[in-house]
Amino acid sequence: MRFAPALTVDKPGCRPYPRPRIMKFCNQCGAPVRLRVPEGDTLPRYVCEACGTIHYQNPRVVVGCVPEHEGRILLCRRAIEPRRGYWTVPAGFLENGETLQQAAARESLEEALAEVAVGSLLSVVHVLHAEQVHVFFRASLPAARYGAGAESLEVALVEPAQIPWADIAFPSTDFTLRRYLEDRAAGREQHHFTTIDRRLRRTPQG
């Protein structure tokens, strides 16, 4: 396992997404909620003023993979915000009732019309400012069959030298692709971990 230093977000227009979650009403009884620290807790939570329900908000999980076919990597150019027009790997939010690997395969089919075989864990990226955890797997694309799904402008199999680094949508994708290529060149499969926080002002080395 390899742990990298925390990264800053330096891609123009790359804002936290989704927006911070703000609650006004209880989803159990419809009464107003108030942000406060409940008794016995240490963090502020939205608490219903009527029924007393405490609404816990936890990080969302984004799952993706790096599909490879005969040495080339499958990339998608986003058709939706955030970062419309920029390139990424197939990825999206984990749904209830599915595993991480199932989510990675589903996103590949939805965004790239590609049926992939999901392999080993590649990276885990804590995106603190967006309240998200991004998980990426290695994957193989058995046949060069793919296309642009509803959320993609175009999809392409590219050689490593053709990756449009300046137009990669998200820092987590950039980190993951670079670690993937490093591992491939070294003939290894490692797990990589890092933290991204746009609130940090320093740019770490390494």
Identify the meaning behind each predicted range.
Residues 25, 45, 66, 75, ...:
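Conserved hydrophobic/aromatic beta-strand scaffold that supports enzyme active sites
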Residues 10-11, 17-19:
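Short, positively charged and aromatic/hydrophobic N-terminal segments
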Residues 94-179, 183-184, 188-190, 200-206:
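Unchanged
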Residues 23-64:
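Acidic, metal-coordinating catalytic segment for phosphate/diphosphate chemistry
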Residues 68-110:
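Conserved Nudix-box catalytic region and its N-terminal flanking loop in Nudix hydrolases
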